[in-house]
Swiss-Prot record:
Entry GO MF terms: rRNA binding; structural constituent of ribosome
Superkingdom of source: Bacteria
Family the UniProt entry places it in: Belongs to the universal ribosomal protein uL15 family.
GO cellular component, one term: cytosolic large ribosomal subunit
InterPro entries: Ribosomal_uL15 (IPR030878), Ribosomal_uL15/eL18 (IPR021131), Ribosomal_uL15/eL18_sf (IPR036227), Ribosomal_uL15_bac-type (IPR005749), Ribosomal_uL15_CS (IPR001196)
Assembly and interaction partners: Part of the 50S ribosomal subunit.
Region (Disordered): 1-59
Name by which UniProt lists this protein: Large ribosomal subunit protein uL15
Record keywords: Ribonucleoprotein, Ribosomal protein, RNA-binding, rRNA-binding
Function in brief: Binds to the 23S rRNA.
Biological process terms in GO annotation: translation
Organism expressing this protein natively: Desulforudis audaxviator (strain MP104C)
């Protein structure tokens, strides 16, 4: 077998049907669209969610709740991710940003207690979970709220 002799398997390359090319083709005249009507026209058909004039499901459902414009969006960091820092490091939001552990544009950083912390670190963040506070203290570090 040579590279120049490679061929696609049988049936892999199917020619597209050319619609409206005369009645002998089997796809002539109406080209598979049937006779007249909305679906036979170019651009014809109903929009997504249209139910023939009946009140659509999305509008039959009641409205609920509201968006709180004062909500704070915290970036979360797990304790196990802080093990990459050297012993005695002061972990601040700026340090986390430099290490690409959080993104820009968040209102604050919350440290969660998933995993184990193996080194004593001073962690400065906007919020801590209870478990995270305990584990940081148990490792000999400090949890400071900014």
């Amino acid at each position: 077998m040579k590279l120049s002799e490679l061929k696609p398997p049988a049936g892999a390359r199917k020619k597209p049907t050319r619609k409206g090319q005369g009645i002998a083709t089997g796809q002539g005249k109406t080209a598979g669209r049937g006779h007249k009507g909305q679906k036979a026209r170019s651009g014809g058909g109903v929009r997504r969610g249209f139910e023939g004039g009946q009140m659509p499901l999305t509008r039959r459902m009641p409205k609920r709740g509201f968006t709180n414009i004062f909500k704070k969006f915290f970036a979360v960091v797990n304790l196990e991710d802080l093990n990459r820092f050297e012993e005695g490091t002061v972990v601040t939001p700026e340090v986390l940003l430099e290490n690409r552990m959080v993104r820009k544009g968040v209102d604050g950083i919350k440290i969660l207690g998933t995993g184990e912390l193996k080194k004593p670190l001073t962690v400065r963040a906007h919020a801590f979970s209870g478990a995270a506070r305990e584990k940081i203290a148990a490792a000999g570090g400090k949890a400071e709220v900014i």
